[in-house]
């Protein structure tokens, strides 16, 4: 029997952050849970919200940390331990400043690219070698501070595209679960 997968959507808790660029991981996690017919519930040992289900014959644990982005690892580390999930079987879904708005890319490992949520996950897991679903939000205009940019709401034009982008990111995550990294990359990177 295949090991379970831990699929984590990164974001910040609370209504103030719900529509910000930094919360795309939460939106995609919610879509995946809805597709599985699963509901998020508090996980007492980690503090995260967790939903469970099955996809492609594998047990899935969907998670949304309920701490701020830069502390995400504090809840992901204990979840991985509780469910006995190795880093290679963890998928982290997150926004990415280094990708053009709306572009979706899959990869294993690599740097954090200034993403404090990823930095926290790497510190908690002790490795960079976990799977990632990267959702492009683009660079801030002009000299705007990237830290402020990721916490802003989308522009009206971007907001109109966000539902489609998040559905595509959920599709990409499902392909990754069903087919593995290389076949999923070949398909997703052609979109």
Curated annotation (Swiss-Prot):
Q: Could you state one GO cellular component term attached to this entry?
A: cytoplasm
> What upregulates it?
Constitutively expressed (at protein level).
* Signal peptide region: none
Q: Which reaction does it catalyse?
A: an N-acyl-L-alpha-aminoacyl-tRNA + H2O = an N-acyl-L-amino acid + a tRNA + H(+); N-acetylglycyl-tRNA(Gly) + H2O = N-acetylglycine + tRNA(Gly) + H(+)
List the CDD domains: PTH
- A GO molecular-function term, please? peptidyl-tRNA hydrolase activity
Instruction: Provide the site residues for: Discriminates between blocked and unblocked aminoacyl-tRNA.
Output: 12
Q: Which UniProt keywords apply?
A: Cytoplasm, Hydrolase, RNA-binding, tRNA-binding
Q: What is the effect of changing residue 12 to D?
A: Does not complement an E.coli temperature-sensitive (ts) mutation
Main EC class of this protein? hydrolase
Q: Which InterPro entries match?
A: Pept_tRNA_hydro, Pept_tRNA_hydro_CS, Pept_tRNA_hydro_sf
Where in the chain is the site Stabilizes the basic form of H active site to accept a proton? 95
| Gene inactivation effect | Essential, it cannot be deleted. Depletion experiments lead to decreased growth. Depletion experiments lead to accumulation of peptidyl tRNAs, in particular all 3 peptidyl-prolyl-tRNA(Pro)s, a reduction in usable aminoacyl tRNA pools and hypersensitivity to macrolide antibiotics that target the 50S subunit.
**Entry-linked Gene3D superfamilies:** Peptidyl-tRNA hydrolase
Q: Where in the cell is it found?
A: Cytoplasm
- Which annotated residues bind tRNA? 17, 68, 70, 116
Q: Oligomeric state and partners?
A: Monomer.
Q: Which family does it belong to?
A: Belongs to the PTH family.
What protein name is recorded for this chain? Answer: Peptidyl-tRNA hydrolase
Task: Show the taxonomic lineage.
Answer: Bacteria, Bacillati, Actinomycetota, Actinomycetes, Mycobacteriales
Gene designation: pth
